[in-house]
């Protein structure tokens, strides 16, 4: 029987991808471009981010101008938390922090250690063992804290699902404040106070903060209340920026505003550990709007930005602010006015510097070594100790890279030699002995990128081979946590969210687990979903890809989750030269009227590429021997296609936008051609969009596709709204 295993055919030498090109909206694009004096390509990109009015665009481009609500107005338990901490500090009782071993958890722990010591607290910390105990506070830690005379336990980046350990702490008479950002369980733990953005309004600008964001809000609010914030906020903001980007938190709302500022502070960091980490990793600050990058700076083997989520929509450069008037607005959460005319503040790090350089060096320690190394790095004021710890991070990250490469190659070899049929299974389950638990999540992301299907990768626990422990990474149409819930009866411990998860189960259930996941995958995945998705903002001609456009892209920065770097495409591009460089990358010279260089990371398997192709890419600046040039980072390539304005990736002659009222509320609706099907989009006054494709009962509801939730449009509240929209469109 023929094997339909959906690996890229060897003879084709092309990545196995599907392209989603956002539909053009020429009238809105023209208006934004003219008013804001920006390129139509940038205007179209803003529209693709659900920013379609002048007011929305101005607020997005200048986040410092937005008046933020005070955190105490948004977080119901913040006042209780501040009272508990204030009383504990004033009585000189012990505070203990329980952190986590990822970059978010370690930066959160370091941030609160610094802040509480600055405020006069007696404070210590503990982080559970990744290999022996797994994620989150546990009863052992609670018992040890109690024996040490701890009066108040403060969790960071964990605790929201730890009902039993928190209940035990209460039995022992220990006060507990939970600070976390993970999903809310059916039953909240019995803590004295819980700070979690998932418990506040979905429209709050604080909704997207990571664990380090919650820790930052708590620390700054406490310092403000005690009148001891002088000299504290700036270093805390640096740690907030490191943790937020490394954790892949959405760079929207308060995250966008604070990260934008933190990236300017980092090159001149007051923290010895940050200085040492920047020095060891070779990161250099750039002038705003120029973003110099040495040859090969973003290489994937330097670090793993996505650290296991299988996404390539992470943040890049930063907005040019050097000519702005200083803002006269002050807010306690960010420390007041930023003088953008200061020479120091005209240089900035970029999210890539953290995502590909600093973050992986921190994360590697939590994955395969002792998190105490990072905590000491980020809390010491001794430059000698900081350099020692930074060098340890460097060495550990190199070990992590080697482990990832070895495991990835072994996993690929298993996939190539197996008889698995991915079009039938629709999910890839790979389990092998001897793999390191700490890095298999990264490998899962790479396998998703390679094969385009959800990946569940595991290895056996050290003691015997009775228990399998693993990590999972999904694709947009597949909800990882729901898949694990579907297999609940087969699993021991598990957790996660839409894009990623972790699990353990008895080895004897491996075949049943694989079958169960395949059954779930068939409920949500079609054959066309089994290719990596490349979302593309607009078509550009090579001659448009100049430094002026590159500097305008800075207006969108910092980019990252929910504000991805712009991706453009060009058709019928000739490849005049191509060669393998580094560890399996392709270096290309392209011609389409103009000549431009390009790099395709980890595409060695597709070498050589056809001589004429359509390409999808991001722009980057490459500096070599003092010369700067625009270079393209290829994300997608396909054989040339004749795509007309009325083709599968562009809107047909449907009305651009129609306004209508339903239940006395205003809405707008529009119809687009997406591939072979039509998609109806309905937007309410809050900016939420309901998107329904022809013939489907399940639609997407949210402010962006990345954070949208699935809804059943046959429910009455949606069904009648859809009927009203179709009537308005005269369908």
Predicted regions: what is each one?
Residues 8, 117, 122, 256-281, ...:
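Acidic, two-metal ion nucleic-acid-processing modules in DNA metabolism proteins
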Residues 100-101, 128-131, 158-159, 181-184, ...:
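Short, ordered loop/turn segments at secondary-structure junctions
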Residues 108-112, 163-172, 181-182, 189-190, ...:
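Short Gly/Thr/Asp-enriched flexible loops that form oxyanion-binding sites at enzyme active sites
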Residues 281-320, 326-333:
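Short, basic, low-complexity termini and linkers enriched in Ser/Thr/Gly/Pro
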């Amino acid at each position: 029987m023929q094997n339909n295993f959906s690996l890229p055919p060897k003879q084709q030498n092309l990545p196995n991808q599907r392209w989603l090109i956002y539909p053009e909206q020429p009238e809105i694009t023209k208006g934004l471009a003219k008013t804001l004096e920006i390129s139509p390509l940038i205007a179209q990109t803003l529209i693709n981010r659900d920013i379609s009015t002048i007011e929305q665009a101005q607020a997005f481009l200048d986040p410092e101008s937005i008046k933020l609500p005070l955190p105490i107005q948004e977080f119901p338990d913040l006042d209780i938390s501040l009272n508990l901490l204030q009383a504990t500090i004033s009585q000189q009782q012990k505070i203990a922090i329980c952190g986590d071993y990822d970059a978010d958890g370690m930066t959160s722990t370091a941030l609160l250690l610094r802040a509480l010591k600055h405020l006069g607290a007696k404070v210590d910390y503990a982080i559970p063992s990744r290999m022996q105990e797994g994620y989150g506070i546990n009863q052992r830690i609670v018992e040890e804290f109690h024996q040490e005379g701890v009066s108040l336990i403060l969790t960071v980046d964990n605790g929201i699902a730890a009902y039993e350990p928190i209940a035990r702490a209460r039995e022992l008479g220990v006060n507990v404040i939970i600070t976390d950002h993970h999903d809310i369980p059916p039953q909240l733990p019995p803590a004295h106070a819980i700070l979690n953005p998932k418990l506040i309004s979905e429209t709050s600008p604080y909704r997207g903060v990571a664990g380090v964001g919650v820790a930052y809000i708590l620390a700054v609010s406490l310092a403000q209340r005690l009148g001891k914030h002088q000299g504290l906020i700036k270093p805390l903001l640096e740690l907030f920026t490191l943790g937020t980007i490394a954790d892949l938190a959405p760079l929207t709302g308060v995250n966008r505003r604070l990260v934008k500022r933190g990236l300017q502070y980092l090159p001149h960091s007051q923290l010895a550990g940050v200085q040492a980490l920047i020095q060891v990793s070779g990161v250099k600050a750039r002038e705003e709007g120029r973003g110099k990058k040495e040859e090969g700076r973003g290489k994937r083997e330097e670090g793993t930005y996505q650290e296991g989520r299988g996404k390539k929509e992470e943040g890049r450069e930063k907005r040019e602010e050097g000519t702005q008037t200083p803002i006269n607005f002050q807010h306690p959460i960010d420390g007041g006015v930023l003088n953008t005319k200061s020479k120091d503040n005209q240089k900035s790090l970029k999210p890539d510097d953290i995502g590909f350089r600093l973050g992986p060096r921190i994360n590697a320690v939590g994955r395969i070594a002792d998190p105490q190394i990072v905590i000491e790095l980020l809390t010491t004021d001794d430059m000698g100790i900081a350099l020692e710890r930074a060098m340890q991070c460097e060495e550990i990250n190199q070990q992590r890279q080697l482990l990832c490469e070895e495991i990835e190659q072994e996993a690929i070899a298993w996939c190539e030699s197996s008889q698995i049929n991915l079009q039938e299974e629709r999910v890839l389950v790979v389990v092998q002995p001897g793999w390191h638990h700490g890095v298999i999540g990264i490998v899962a992301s790479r396998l998703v990128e390679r094969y385009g299907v959800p990946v569940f990768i595991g290895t056996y626990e050290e003691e015997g081979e009775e228990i399998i422990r693993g990590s999972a990474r999904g694709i947009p149409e597949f909800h990882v946590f729901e898949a694990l819930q579907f297999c609940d009866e087969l699993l021991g411990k598990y957790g996660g969210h839409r894009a990623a998860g972790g699990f353990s189960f008895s080895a004897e259930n491996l075949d049943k687990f694989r079958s169960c996941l395949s059954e779930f995958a068939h409920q949500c995945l079609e054959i066309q979903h089994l290719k990596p998705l490349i979302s593309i903002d607009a078509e550009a001609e090579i001659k448009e890809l100049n430094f002026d456009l590159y500097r305008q892209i800075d207006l969108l920065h910092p980019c990252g989750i929910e504000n991805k770097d712009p991706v453009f495409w060009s058709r019928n591009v000739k490849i005049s030269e191509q060669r393998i460089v580094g560890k399996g990358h392709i270096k290309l010279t392209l011609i389409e009227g103009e000549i431009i260089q390009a790099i395709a990371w980890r595409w060695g398997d597709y070498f050589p590429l056809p001589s004429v192709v359509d390409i999808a890419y991001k722009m980057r600046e490459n500096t070599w021997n003092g010369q700067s040039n625009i270079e393209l980072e290829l994300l997608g390539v396909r054989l040339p296609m004749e795509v007309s304005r009325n083709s599968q990736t562009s809107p047909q002659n449907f009305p651009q936008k129609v306004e209508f009222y339903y239940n006395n509320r205003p809405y707008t609706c529009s119809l687009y051609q997406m591939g072979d099907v039509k998609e109806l989009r309905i937007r309410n006054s809050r900016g939420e969009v309901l998107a329904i494709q022809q013939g489907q009962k399940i639609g997407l509801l949210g402010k962006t596709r990345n954070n949208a939730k699935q809804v059943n449009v046959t429910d009455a509240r949606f069904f009648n709204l859809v009927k009203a929209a179709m009537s308005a469109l005269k369908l």
